[in-house]
């Protein structure tokens, strides 16, 4: 009788490396290790040999980068999705796509179980399992970190050393790092104390702003209907643009975020993020929206941006609500076409200029020179009607 198969979302990090051995022994099952490429740099080398040497019976590497950029990142950018006005949702955006890829492989390999390496008090367990339930409700879900005997990363490291499992984490530097092309999240270790300044060795790609070049860098980004299409006059794929902006931004200290955030499970956590390209593109996109969106649309979209960010963060990407919000966002982005020029300097971004064929800025109406075409006399009647409700209230309710 053949053994059951477990499809494991495998990153090659400490948790999932230990997990292959642990799942194989506990369930007497074959482990299909599945890794999705979301543009991470450090984690993909030698993953296949590492998975097999740790006990996996099969390994699948799925290149998700193009899909990630075009169907996930650009949707979030157009929506202006920044969780609690700060986090560009790099890890959160990647989870539903990774979960979908795991389900796809599991069905192809006739697996009966899905396993992930998410902690029992984190957000990712929600994101993975809600996606699993949406796409493959008949498959059993395993969450080893909620049930195994290890109570700390140090215990996992000891287990790995005992069973000759190669891991990069050490007891001296136990950071937990998740990386994709949209950003990097760093947690654990000394970072758990919110009063501790993040050590420089916690940062993976960005130069310290103090050590960034003394000469500012400038970039010009072209958007078409809310989507970036060209950098400094050169048309390129979304993947190439994000990679280039990550390099430019990181060199200039852009995109370091230190945040206390509200997790799905009800606790606050301290998170360190690096997201150079995301920080630059969100800044540029927002400035172009200021130029091209009608006032009420611009102001109302702020609410939608938060709703969209919450959907991503809370793991409900495959919900009807997200699809409904996409329809609204796509409508708002029709005029968001133009150029934005930015200065990057020692961790800061400043605006150098912007223009659009759909600009709602009318210099003849805005100017205070003789070229002014604004009808000043019309203001008196407008103000009378605009303030009539408050005037009436005060007359009826004096002193209130």
UniProtKB/Swiss-Prot annotation:
Entry EC number(s): 6.3.4.5
CDD domains noted in UniProt: ASS (cd01999)
Pathway: Amino-acid biosynthesis; L-arginine biosynthesis; L-arginine from L-ornithine and carbamoyl phosphate: step 2/3
InterPro entries for the chain: Arginosuc_syn_C, Arginosuc_syn_N, Arginosuc_synth, Arginosuc_synth_CS, Arginosuc_synth_type_1_subfam, AS_cat/multimer_dom_body, Rossmann-like_a/b/a_fold
GO process terms (BP): argininosuccinate metabolic process; L-arginine biosynthetic process; urea cycle
Major subcellular location class: cytoplasm
Keywords for this protein: Amino-acid biosynthesis, Arginine biosynthesis, ATP-binding, Cytoplasm, Ligase, Nucleotide-binding
HAMAP family per record: Arg_succ_synth_type1
Similarity comment text for this entry: Belongs to the argininosuccinate synthase family. Type 1 subfamily.
Identification of the protein by name: Argininosuccinate synthase
Organism: Chlorobium limicola (strain DSM 245 / NBRC 103803 / 6330)
């Amino acid at each position: 009788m053949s053994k059951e198969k477990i499809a494991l979302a495998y990153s090659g990090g400490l948790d999932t490396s230990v997990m292959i051995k642990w799942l194989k022994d506990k369930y007497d099952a074959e482990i299909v290790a599945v890794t999705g490429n979301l543009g991470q740099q450090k984690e993909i080398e030698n993953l296949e040999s590492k998975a097999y040497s740790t006990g996996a019976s099969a390994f699948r590497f799925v290149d998700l980068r193009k899909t990630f950029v075009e169907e996930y990142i650009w949707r979030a950018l157009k929506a202006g999705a920044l969780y609690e006005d700060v986090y560009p949702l790099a890890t959160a955006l990647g989870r539903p796509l990774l979960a979908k890829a795991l389900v796809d492989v599991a069905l192809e390999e006739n697996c009966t179980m899905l396993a992930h390496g998410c902690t029992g008090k984190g957000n990712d367990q929600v994101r993975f399992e809600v996606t699993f339930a949406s796409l493959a409700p008949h498959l059993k879900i395993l969450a080893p970190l909620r049930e195994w005997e290890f109570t700390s990363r140090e215990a996992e490291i000891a287990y790995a050393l005992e069973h000759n499992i190669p891991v990069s984490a050490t007891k001296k530097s136990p950071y937990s790092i998740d990386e994709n092309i949209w950003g990097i999240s760093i947690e654990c270790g000394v970072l758990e104390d919110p009063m501790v300044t993040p050590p420089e060795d916690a940062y993976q790609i960005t130069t310290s702003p103090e050590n960034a070049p003394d000469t500012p860098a400038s970039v010009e980004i072209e958007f078409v209907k809310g989507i970036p299409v060209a950098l400094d006059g050169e048309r390129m794929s979304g993947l190439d643009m994000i990679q280039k902006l990550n390099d430019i931004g990181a060199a200039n200290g852009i995109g370091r975020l230190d945040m206390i955030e509200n997790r799905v499970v009800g606790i606050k956590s301290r998170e360190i993020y690096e997201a150079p390209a995301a920080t630059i593109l969100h800044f540029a996109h927002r400035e172009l929206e200021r130029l091209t969106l009608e006032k009420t649309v611009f102001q109302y979209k702020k609410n939608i941006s938060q709703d969209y960010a919450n959907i991503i963060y809370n793991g409900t990407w495959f919900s009807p609500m997200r699809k409904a919000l996409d329809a609204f966002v796509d409508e708002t982005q029709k005029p968001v076409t133009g150029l934005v020029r930015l200065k990057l300097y020692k961790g800061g971004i400043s605006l150098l200029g912007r223009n659009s064929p759909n600009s709602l800025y009318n210099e003849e109406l805005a100017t205070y020179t003789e070229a002014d075409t604004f009808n000043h006399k019309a203001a008196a009647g407008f103000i009378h009607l605009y303030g009539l409700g408050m005037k009436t209230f005060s007359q009826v309710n004096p002193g209130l």
